[in-house]
Structure formats: structure tokens, C-alpha cells
């Protein structure tokens, strides 16, 4: 009974000194992971799957087709008609490749690749070119003038 009078009851942040056991911590660097391996702690590496600002790829069907086939499939390229339409529209506006690139906020090499048919089609770049040049570059009717802007 004298033990009850001499023992201390600790309340607060230090109540679990020694008896709490190891806590689960997240190692953010490779050095922390290596230190945990050396000390013999239980180690689990998990990958975060959900992300707030991640985008899924738009090439899903194409990649599946590539996986299922044995031969080598080249990535899609811009059609020659699109390149010719860009050259024609650019010359009508009196723009150089560099000036067009500045207007669409891209590098001159990108414009050159589209005109020569080497580029992979990017919808954002094509839409910027359509707006600056005033001609259609996607779908059917490539090279025809864009219609008037819609009313809101």
C-alpha cells in the first residue's frame, strides 16, 4: 500500500515515456529511409495514388493498341494539309515563323515542326494557331476561314 503513495501519476505530453512503443513516421528523404533500414525498424514503402492536380493521359486507347501489337507503331504526326494551311495562313497575314511563335507563345521550332509535318498534334497549340491565323486546322474543312465568334 505504500507503493500507491510513492508512485507518480503524470498527466500530459510525457505520460507515455518508454511505454508507447515506436510511432509510425513518414520518411521523406532517401537518407531517412536508409537510417530506418540500418536501425532495423519495420519499413513499408507506399506510393501515393491520389493527387489533387494530376491529369490522366489522353492516349489511353492508343497505348493499349500499342501494348497489344507486336510491331513498332510511330506516334501520330500532323498531316501535310495542316502544314500547308499554316504556311498559307501565315503568309496571308504577313507573319514569319518567329512572329507567329511569339503570338501563340511557343518556340519557333514548334511552328517549324507543324509546318513540316514532324510535330505530334497538340490541341492547345493548334487552337492557338487557328485563332491567330483565322483558319481551321482541325477536323474537316482544314484551311477554310473560321466562322464568326458565337454570341453569349
Curated annotation (Swiss-Prot):
InterPro entries: Cro/C1-type_HTH, Lambda_DNA-bd_dom_sf, MBF1_N. It comes from Yarrowia lipolytica (strain CLIB 122 / E 150) (Yeast). The gene is MBF1. It holds the Pfam family MBF1. The keyword tRNA-binding does not apply. The keyword Protease does not apply. One of its GO terms (molecular function) is ribosome binding. This is Putative multi-protein-binding factor 1. Disulfide bonds: none annotated. Belongs to the MBF1 family. Residues 97-116 bind DNA. The lineage of its organism: Eukaryota, Fungi, Dikarya, Ascomycota, Saccharomycotina. It comes from the Eukaryota. SUPFAM superfamilies: lambda repressor-like DNA-binding domains. GO terms for cellular component: cytoplasm; nucleus. Transcriptional coactivator that stimulates GCN4-dependent transcriptional activity by bridging the DNA-binding region of GCN4 and TBP (SPT15), thereby recruiting TBP to GCN4-bound promoters. Involved in induction of the ribosome quality control (RQC) pathway; a pathway that degrades nascent peptide chains during problematic translation. Required to prevent stalled ribosomes from frameshifting. CDD domains: HTH_XRE (cd00093). Keywords: Activator, DNA-binding, Transcription, Transcription regulation. Residues 1-24 are annotated as: Disordered. One of its GO terms (biological process) is rescue of stalled ribosome. Residues 86-140 form the HTH cro/C1-type domain.
Amino acid at each position: 500500500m505504500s507503493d500507491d503513495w510513492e508512485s507518480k501519476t503524470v498527466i500530459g505530453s510525457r505520460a507515455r515515456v518508454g511505454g508507447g512503443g515506436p510511432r509510425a513516421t513518414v520518411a521523406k528523404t532517401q537518407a531517412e529511409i536508409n537510417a530506418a533500414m540500418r536501425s532495423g525498424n519495420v519499413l513499408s514503402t507506399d506510393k501515393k495514388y491520389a493527387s489533387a492536380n494530376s491529369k490522366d493521359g489522353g492516349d489511353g486507347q492508343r497505348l493499349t493498341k500499342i501494348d497489344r501489337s507486336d510491331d513498332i507503331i510511330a506516334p501520330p504526326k500532323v498531316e501535310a494539309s495542316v502544314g500547308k494551311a499554316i504556311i498559307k495562313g501565315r503568309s496571308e497575314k504577313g507573319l514569319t515563323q518567329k512572329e507567329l511563335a511569339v503570338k501563340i507563345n511557343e518556340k519557333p521550332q514548334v511552328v517549324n515542326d507543324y509546318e513540316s509535318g514532324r510535330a505530334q498534334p497538340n490541341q492547345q497549340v493548334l487552337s492557338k494557331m487557328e485563332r491567330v491565323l483565322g483558319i481551321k486546322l482541325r477536323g474537316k474543312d482544314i484551311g477554310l476561314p473560321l466562322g464568326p465568334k458565337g454570341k453569349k
